[in-house]
Amino acid sequence: MTAQLIDGNALSRQLRTEVAARTAALKDRGITPGLAVVLVGDNPASQVYVRNKVKACEDVGFHSVLEKYDASMTEEQLLARVQALNNDPSIHGILVQLPLPKHIDDHKVIEAISPLKDVDGFHVASAGALMVGQVGFKACTPYGCMKMLESIGMKDLRGKHAVVIGRSNIVGKPMAMMLLAANATVTVCHSGTADLAAMTRQADVVVAAVGKRNVLTADMVKPGAVVIDVGMNRNDEGKLCGDVDFEGVKQVAGYITPVPGGVGPMTITMLLVNTLEAAERL
């Protein structure tokens, strides 16, 4: 058996077409969704991510603002910029690209963003809303993963066992909560898990999100399982790869996401969805 690919690029195109149509309808009412992206420092990877996000905004008809600052920017200065964007009626979503320089407290900056404009879904208000099942912005990467599951007919995961490898605030924890909300039985594995393979072999859905190559290999996967690879790493040849041993696991799994072309484009797409919904709530 060879797994079917869940094509993140194709699904993203479909969803972005829907976003563009809803954006056009909003513009007819005199509202243009606006996203502000703030980049501090010259991290090369961050510059690529930011460029992709701004282009995606332009493609669907959003108003986007990119603010670039030198790494010497103080925390106080950044907090002041965030507050100014909170008060800007043309901006519906604020994204501060992480990581920030070491002298700036990521958490303090995220908490300074208005929960009404927290389109990354990282604010404690957003995390709390997810926890208790209220309406709030969902973290973009796990939100994209859920859309990928929906695309293969797995919107309701009742009776399914899902294993999340990773417990970060950005992916692992919100991923577990979204799977739980979809009625899955959820196990979260991490560096303190004694026998990872024993857990993953029972799973109908595995989400790998630790940033470590080959954390999931073919012998660890239940035949026919759905494998979602959130990882972004480089192999020995310098090529982009995920957390999953793709070539091996695709021989066992029922569905698998590729890297690149899987979760990555979906993350940006869900950022667009969140920004659009922020504008629609006006």
Swiss-Prot record:
Pathway: One-carbon metabolism; tetrahydrofolate interconversion. It catalyses: (6R)-5,10-methylene-5,6,7,8-tetrahydrofolate + NADP(+) = (6R)-5,10-methenyltetrahydrofolate + NADPH; (6R)-5,10-methenyltetrahydrofolate + H2O = (6R)-10-formyltetrahydrofolate + H(+). It comes from the Bacteria. GO terms for cellular component: cytosol. GO terms for biological process: L-histidine biosynthetic process; methionine biosynthetic process; purine nucleotide biosynthetic process; tetrahydrofolate interconversion. The keyword Amino-acid biosynthesis applies. SUPFAM superfamilies: Aminoacid dehydrogenase-like, N-terminal domain, NAD(P)-binding Rossmann-fold domains. Transmembrane segments: none annotated. This is Bifunctional protein FolD. InterPro entries: Aminoacid_DH-like_N_sf, NAD(P)-bd_dom_sf, THF_DH/CycHdrlase, THF_DH/CycHdrlase_cat_dom, THF_DH/CycHdrlase_CS, THF_DH/CycHdrlase_NAD-bd_dom. Keywords: Amino-acid biosynthesis, Histidine biosynthesis, Hydrolase, Methionine biosynthesis, Multifunctional enzyme, NADP, One-carbon metabolism, Oxidoreductase, Purine biosynthesis. GO terms for molecular function: methenyltetrahydrofolate cyclohydrolase activity; methylenetetrahydrofolate dehydrogenase (NADP+) activity. Belongs to the tetrahydrofolate dehydrogenase/cyclohydrolase family. Catalyzes the oxidation of 5,10-methylenetetrahydrofolate to 5,10-methenyltetrahydrofolate and then the hydrolysis of 5,10-methenyltetrahydrofolate to 10-formyltetrahydrofolate. Homodimer. The keyword Ion transport does not apply. NADP(+) binds at G166, R167, S168, S191. Signal peptide: none annotated. Its EC number is 1.5.1.5, 3.5.4.9. It comes from Acidovorax sp. (strain JS42). Coiled coil: none annotated.
